[in-house]
């Protein structure tokens, strides 16, 4: 985002860039409904409106894009902090952090109703919320936005320090350690919960990403060692395609249809083989796309 939005930052006409932003948001949201929202089931009763990682990315991207376009760096930091604090207030004072007692869960149930993932229908036509589905989405959109902003900040650091790789590595690692430390302190009051994507979880996961980014930046950009890492580029250049393929198409069935004879020899490890074969098939498809320069652009 820091790279692609820089040319639109000072342009008073934000119409063209907003059209691109809305297009990306809609496409990612629809892809999310295809992957997990049961859109292809063509059954309105089992349609889930907001239930997938791609939709979380779409919402986070939309929030972060607006912040990037209309705020300078100082205000970007302030607004990102406000997103975390605004999320925290009702989560702390209007509920607890139990699966059914948290504020974010109540918002999802109230707004989405039977269009929420985890709902099951009874024979009499009534429906109920599942006690085993505890992911939250609507209120957690605030922290999704903060997560994308952390990624944008990492991009700004790398863009600004392209002529000083050592400083980039140091900055990424220091921020990563600081975010993790702060998240652990905050977790004493607000637990680190992935399914709720709490503010502490946002900082913790962001800290890990900064550390990983620093490590890879050190190895590849600073030291110039990229041998053995090309497979990451194959995945990274078509990451959304990889995710959709792996979730929508059951390649395990394809693997089982041609390797069922191995089950008698592998025993309990046969399922492990099928899982490996599933990812192998996806990788081979991505490799062909990479070599043919076919990339899914949103």
Which residues make up each language-model segment?
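Alpha-helical transmembrane segments and their immediate juxtamembrane cytosolic regions
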Residues: 1-298
């Amino acid at each position: 985002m820091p790279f692609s939005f820089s040319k639109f930052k000072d342009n008073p006409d934000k119409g063209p860039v907003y059209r691109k932003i809305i297009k990306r948001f809609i496409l990612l949201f629809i892809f999310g409904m295809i992957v997990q929202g049961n859109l292809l089931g063509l059954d309105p009763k089992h349609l889930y409106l907001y239930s997938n990682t791609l939709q979380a990315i779409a919402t986070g991207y939309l929030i972060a894009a607006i912040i990037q376009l209309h705020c300078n760096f100082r205000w970007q930091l302030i607004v990102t902090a406000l997103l975390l604090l605004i999320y925290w207030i009702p989560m702390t004072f209007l509920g607890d952090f139990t699966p059914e007692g948290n504020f974010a869960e109540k918002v999802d149930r109230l707004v989405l109703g039977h269009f929420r993932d985890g709902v099951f229908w009874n024979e009499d036509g009534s429906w109920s919320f599942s006690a085993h589905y505890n992911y939250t989405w609507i209120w957690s959109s605030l922290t999704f936005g903060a997560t994308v902003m952390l990624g944008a900040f990492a991009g700004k650091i790398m863009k600004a320090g392209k002529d000083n790789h050592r400083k980039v590595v140091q900055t990424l690692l220091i921020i990563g350690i600081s975010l993790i430390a702060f998240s652990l302190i905050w977790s004493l009051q607000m637990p680190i919960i992935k399914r709720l994507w709490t503010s502490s979880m946002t900082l913790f996961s962001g800290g890990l990403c900064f550390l990983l980014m620093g490590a890879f930046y050190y190895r590849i950009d600073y030291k110039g060692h990229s041998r053995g890492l090309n497979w990451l580029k194959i995945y990274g250049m078509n990451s959304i395609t990889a995710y959709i393929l792996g979730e929508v198409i059951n390649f395990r069935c394809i693997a089982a249809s041609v390797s069922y004879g191995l089950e008698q020899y592998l025993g309990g490890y046969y399922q492990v083989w099928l899982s490996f074969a599933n990812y192998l098939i996806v990788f081979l498809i991505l490799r062909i796309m990479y070599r043919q320069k076919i990339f899914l652009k949103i």
